[in-house]
Amino acid sequence: WSAELYLAGAKESDIRDALRERQIRVEEVDWQKIHLLGDLGSEKLTDYYNLCDVFCMPSYFEAYGLVFAEALTYGLPCIGRDKFAMSEFIEDGCTGRLISGEDAEELALDLWEVLQDPKYREEVERRREWYLREYSWDKVAQRICSVMEKNERDKDQYRSACLLYTSPSPRD
């Protein structure tokens, strides 16, 4: 099995530091198959989404996970952790895989499965129009604005409730 790894958003020095932390000797890494892309503009990012067969980001923290929605709109099955918002976008065993721990072997097996089994790509392709409609930047921006407007409308109600709850009542 031969694969190439494209790392976007990471600086080479950060990758080398991470390898050293894990006691992997930098000189043992096949740098011919690892491409450190750094920060990409949207046009370049589109090129790489179109080049890849799977999107993998088993992040320790991903508050919203919009990057998974973005990858799905390009027809890419996704691999992420079963934490935070990743499970909102990835349906385990259907549109990708959710990994539970930090086991590199588990990650490698899931990558192999997603790359070898066409059902993942077929399912993402089947849902692609829905992803494009529901996760367009306009639609996401509308949702975020809606939540912010609701919070703004409701803030006085919550502040009053909080004040009522925390204010001591006179007993004399």
Q: Model-derived features: where do they sit?
A:
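Nucleotide-activated donor-binding/catalytic signature segment of Leloir-type glycosyltransferases, i.e.
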Residues: 9, 18-40
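Short alpha-helical donor nucleotide-sugar binding micro-motif in glycosyltransferases
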Residues: 39-40, 47-52
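Aromatic "clamp/platform" in nucleotide-sugar-dependent glycosyltransferases that forms part
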Residues: 60
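Short hydrophobic beta-strand element within catalytic cores of glycosyltransferases
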Residues: 77-80
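Conserved acidic donor-binding segment of nucleotide-sugar-dependent glycosyltransferases
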Residues: 92-93, 97-104, 113-118
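A short, well-ordered alpha-helix in the C-terminal region of glycosyltransferases
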Residues: 119-134
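Conserved small/polar residues in nucleotide/adenosyl-binding loops
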Residues: 165-172
